[in-house]
UniProtKB/Swiss-Prot annotation:
This is Nucleotide-binding protein LJ_0866. ATP binds at residues 13-20. Pfam families: PapZ_C, RapZ-like_N. The keyword GTP-binding applies. It comes from the Bacteria. InterPro entries: P-loop_NTPase, RapZ-like, RapZ-like_N, RapZ_C.
Length: 291
């Protein structure tokens, strides 16, 4: 079986066209990313990646420093094409002059070649230098009318894989007395629900026990709350997915994380799993099991 070629993505383009957004998006997709790599080191970088089993895909972001910089980049890219183990793609990010001027004014920064302080002169000089690189690029994305979210979506569509596009949910129960989970995206306080703690026959058990679960979920207050909570989540989750979120953590909390939060988390995981991949965890459960 032929050895699968490793992927090398070379990201370049106009300053202010979105390379910073591209870095973050590619890292989220599992790329090993190096920013501002000098072109003369491209071959050495690829040799390092190609000889390592830790990286299956890598990206380099090349920044304009001097006028000869991009001449070197094109030469290095062409030399890489002779390698039998490299599958390289050149991504060029572009934007119109007026959009770039507007972006620079918002950030109060100057293009790298705006030596006289004139924005448009610096942009036009950079565009002239980059023309050769743009001509050899495999993919050109004009970001003039793209939001950060839209650019990220385009990058995921072009360079992501099925794994990176998978959205998943973690449902966890916890006890407020032990602190709110710092990684939670949504925190729901269910301390207002009827508490099995005050039922002697149920107090020793947890929401993993059928008796406790049935007690919590059968209450009128629970039914009314849960129906609205589930409806809210089913409305909100598609929005999280549209924003590019890959994992949503929903934390359900009661006083000690023993009865109510565990019961609600169990039911929520079952219902959300009908549409999405769901993992469930009970942060405090070890405090009560085996007592």
């Amino acid at each position: 079986m032929a050895e699968q070629k490793k992927q090398l993505l070379i990201v370049t383009g106009m300053s202010g066209a979105g390379k910073t957004v591209a870095i973050k998006a590619l890292e989220d997709m599992g790329y090993f990313v190096v920013d501002n790599l000098p072109p003369e080191l491209l071959g050495s970088f690829w040799e390092l990646i190609n000889n390592s089993s830790d990286f299956s895909k890598a990206a380099v972001v090349v920044d304009l420093r001097v006028k000869s910089f991009y001449k070197d980049l094109v030469d290095e890219i062409k030399s890489l094409e002779d390698s039998q183990n490299v599958q390289s793609t050149v991504l060029f990010l572009d934007a119109s002059d007026d959009v770039l001027v507007s972006r620079y004014k918002e950030t109060r920064r100057l293009p790298p070649l705006a030596h006289t302080g004139r924005l448009l002169d610096g942009i036009q000089e950079e565009r002239n230098i980059l023309s050769r690189t743009k001509n050899i690029s495999n993919i050109i994305i004009d970001t003039s009318h793209l939001s950060t979210k839209e650019l990220k979506t385009k990058l995921v569509d072009k360079f992501g894989d099925n794994r990176t596009r998978t959205f998943s949910i973690e449902v966890m129960s916890f006890g407020f007395k032990y602190g709110i989970p710092i990684d939670a995206d949504i925190v729901m306080d269910v301390r207002f629900l009827p508490n099995p703690f005050y039922i002697p026959q149920l107090k020793p058990f947890t929401g993993l026990d059928r008796r406790v679960f049935d007690y919590v979920m059968s209450k009128k207050e629970t039914k009314e709350f849960y129906a609205k909570f589930l409806d809210m989540l089913e409305t909100a989750i598609p929005g999280y997915i549209a924003e590019g979120k890959e994992k949503l953590t929903i934390a359900i909390g009661c006083t000690g994380g023993q009865h109510r939060s565990v019961s609600i988390a169990r039911q929520l995981a079952v219902d959300l799993a009908k549409k999405y991949p769901v993992d469930i965890s009970h942060r405090e459960i070890s405090r009560y099991i085996g007592q």
